[in-house]
């Protein structure tokens, strides 16, 4: 979804944009295929996401430069501490885009080639679910004194990742995957 949101936000694709997706895709000597066998197909971007097609994701995702891919990963918090109020949080791993090899520059488009924590992953989806705004994770919503007085903690302002329109498009893409695609 990170790649989809970046592409849609930058105006490089829409859910209804149509692509000719090959059975296998070879770019820069790197060959990509999908988890299921298929011939060449005409697919909308929504259809590519619907069936989690690595070939289609790389085909469309290469519209983003390597640096743009890296910047979107970092913007969403991959390889960064989330700021949650717990000790022992891991940062995750993302190599600088200038150090990506011939394969990693493409696998990052479909979620491989980086190491992110489950919380970092949840934060990506949380931002899309919050109309494009990523909120800082927190454990404590309120503190209740011994006398029963509740002290609500203020919610910190979030950071805009994508527009409300892009977030809504991504939510629709995800709903389609769950209702009709490979996540059912």
Annotated model-derived regions:
Residues 2-184:
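Beta-lactam-recognizing serine transpeptidase/beta-lactamase-like catalytic domain environment
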């Amino acid at each position: 979804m990170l790649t989809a949101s970046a592409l849609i936000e930058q105006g490089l694709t829409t859910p209804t944009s149509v692509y000719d997706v090959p059975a296998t895709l070879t770019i820069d000597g790197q060959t990509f295929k999908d988890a299921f066998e298929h011939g060449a197909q005409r697919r909308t971007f929504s259809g590519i996401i619907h069936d989690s097609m690595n070939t289609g994701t790389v085909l469309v995702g290469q519209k983003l430069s390597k640096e743009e891919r890296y910047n979107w990963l970092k913007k969403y918090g991959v390889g960064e501490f989330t700021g949650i109020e717990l000790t022992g949080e891991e940062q995750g791993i993302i190599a600088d885009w200038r150090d990506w090899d011939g394969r990693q520059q493409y696998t990052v488009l479909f979620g491989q080639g980086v190491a992110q924590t489950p919380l970092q992953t949840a934060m990506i989806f949380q931002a899309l679910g919050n109309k494009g705004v990523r909120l800082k994770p927190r454990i404590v919503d309120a503190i209740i004194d011994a006398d029963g007085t509740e002290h609500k903690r203020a919610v910190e302002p979030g950071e805009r990742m994508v527009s409300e329109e892009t977030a809504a498009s991504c939510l629709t893409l995800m709903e389609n995957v769950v209702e009709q695609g490979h996540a059912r």
